[in-house]
Regions:
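Peripheral, non-transmembrane regulatory/ligand-interaction domains of membrane transport proteins
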Residues: 1-209
Length: 210
């Protein structure tokens, strides 16, 4: 799915046509949609497909006419009527004209921007948008970590009163989520450090508070 957003008079609007200063949000895009965006903005289709591969690692790559930023974001996976916490890739691509996000699924990381719930957000301020997305992502990780911590405490209490395997399996699953999150946060930190050193990403004094 392709959705186009643009800030006008301080408000976010969904648009029907591509134009400079827009944010193009690709969610589980089809092969046709990938080729359309790739051809329009001179992007290697493989770079648009990369965030759709769950095995992709966080990284930043700079090409002649665009920069690809890949980070891990937290996601909730439902199994056996329970919520489990995993990570999936999300791509941010900046060109001279637009900013593009690519993800396998809808994510709260981007939902707040689409709904106009983020202050001082402008689709044409690409560097600020990237930093705001990374901040929102880090906040979501922390939110889920608090939930995992609370769930772990409840299960540990049950384990003291029970010897059932079910509680032990749940605790091991939560421990696995913590490992995923820790690894992803470290990788994202490296990407952020490289991003701040990247000469192709313009830096503005007003973004230092982010």
């Amino acid at each position: 799915m392709i959705r186009i957003f643009k800030t006008e008079n301080g408000l976010i609007h969904q648009k029907d046509e591509l134009s400079p200063g827009s944010w193009i949000a690709l969610t589980n895009p089809t092969a046709t949609e990938i080729l359309e965006i790739a051809n329009t903005y001179g992007i290697d289709p493989d770079d648009l497909r990369a965030p759709l591969d769950e095995e992709e690692r966080s990284r930043i790559e700079t090409e002649d006419n665009y920069t690809l930023i890949l980070v891990d974001i937290p996601s909730i996976e439902e199994r056996n009527d329970k919520d489990w916490y995993v990570t999936i890739p999300m791509g941010i691509i900046t060109t001279e004209e637009v900013i593009i996000t690519v993800c396998l699924e809808e994510t709260p990381v981007l939902g707040a921007f689409m709904d106009g719930r983020v202050r001082d957000f402008h689709t044409y301020m690409k560097t600020r948008f990237i930093l705001q997305v990374l901040y929102k992502n880090a906040s979501l990780f922390l939110q889920y970590l608090r939930i995992i911590d609370k769930k772990s405490g409840v299960i540990e209490e049950k384990l003291h009163k029970s010897t059932k395997n079910r509680e032990l399996i749940e605790l091991l699953e939560l421990e696995k989520s913590l490992v995923y999150f820790t690894t992803s946060l470290r990788s994202n930190e490296v990407v952020l450090e490289k991003l701040m050193r990247n000469e192709k990403i313009k830096k503005y004094p007003e973004d230092t508070d982010l």
